[in-house]
Design a protein with these regions (language model features):
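A short, aliphatic-rich alpha-helical micro-motif
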Residues: 44-45, 63-66, 148
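Rossmann-fold NAD(P)-binding glycine/threonine-rich loop
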Residues: 80-92
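Phosphate-binding beta-alpha-beta segment of Rossmann-like dinucleotide-binding domains, i.e.
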Residues: 90, 98-152
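Short beta->alpha connector loops at strand-helix junctions that form conserved
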Residues: 34, 75-76, 92-103, 180
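Rossmann-like dinucleotide/phosphate-binding beta-alpha-beta segment
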Residues: 139-182
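N-terminal glycine-/charge-rich "phosphate-binding" loop or analogous flexible N-terminal tail
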Residues: 1-48
Length: 182
């Protein structure tokens, strides 16, 4: 059986330099491009059986010129960068990484909430500038902290990420609710 030719059009989006791509190389002939400009998509993918993309947009005009293409893998949770209807017309399945990053995104939401409540960045800058040590009593409350307990917070969307945000915030004693269109 012929090993597939796999092309990753924008590998920099997943690899800050710490991946060797071995697991993909084991599957077939693999080429990873850091970035691919729109005008280079066809030339870089002409022999591809499989394209992996994260942000590089693929449309009908590409599928028309890539007769060997058998699969598109989106290295993200969504696949809005792909003209899925056109891919379907050409018999090209599109898959994504559903559930990828749920914990990391929820953690970032909580980090931003804690920044709003505690102003960590503000106090870090104040410490670096010497503000704290210049106070007569070596105490600085130039911005009050917000305690999260008993504060109300609504989460818009109750999918995987919304549920995880609520799970992470429960220990703070907040009054949490979710709003969803479903």
């Amino acid at each position: 059986m012929k090993r597939p030719h796999i092309v990753f059009l924008d590998a920099h989006t997943l690899n800050p330099g710490d991946l060797d791509w071995k697991c993909i190389k084991d599957l077939g002939e693999f080429t990873a491009y850091e970035r691919t400009e729109r005008e280079n998509i066809i030339s870089r993918s002409i022999e591809a059986d499989i394209i992996i993309t994260n942000k590089t947009v693929l449309r009908r005009e590409h599928f028309e010129k890539l007769p060997k293409l058998r699969l598109i893998c989106v290295a993200a949770t969504g696949f809005d960068v792909i003209d899925v209807a056109a891919a379907r017309e050409f018999g090209i399945p599109v898959c994504n990484c559903a559930g990828y990053g749920t914990r990391a995104v929820a953690q970032m939401v909580v980090a931003h909430l804690l920044e709003v409540a505690n102003r960590v960045g503000h106090y870090t800058a104040a410490c670096h500038s010497g503000f704290w040590s210049q106070q007569n009593d070596f105490c600085s409350w130039n911005n009050p902290l917000m305690e999260l307990q008993d504060k109300k917070m609504g989460v818009i969307g109750f999918g995987n990420i919304g549920r995880e945000v609520i799970n992470l915030l429960r220990p703070f004693g907040m009054l949490l609710f979710a709003v969803t269109s479903k």
